[in-house]
Amino acid sequence: MEIKRLTAAKTKISDVTSGKYVALPGFESNYVLAKDGQRLSRVRILATIVDKFLSESGRFAAITLDDSTDTIRAKAFNAVAVFDPLSAGDIVDFVGKVREYQGELFLVPEIIRKIDDPNDEL
């Protein structure tokens, strides 16, 4: 069986945070079932970074994304360098997977691109 990468759905943070997380067994992709019925496993969000955190050990980092509909954290474990060039106030085009741990929905980054002009076509 060939495993295909799911397309990242361009969405709002509120679509993710207001949905219901569905965990599937095995290698099937977990997803958030949005209120409109859309399955969100990989998402693409245009947002502003409002907070950045790096643990003392340097093995965990997180940013908080805000797109004016809601906020959500993106977390990196061990591969924290992905957040190095980013600062609070930066506008980013974020692609990542939706995950849930202990009731908190969060994103795991795959691609983060700083945006100079949010009016440019993405």
Give the label of every model feature segment.
Residues 1-122:
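OB-fold and OB-like single-stranded nucleic-acid-recognition modules
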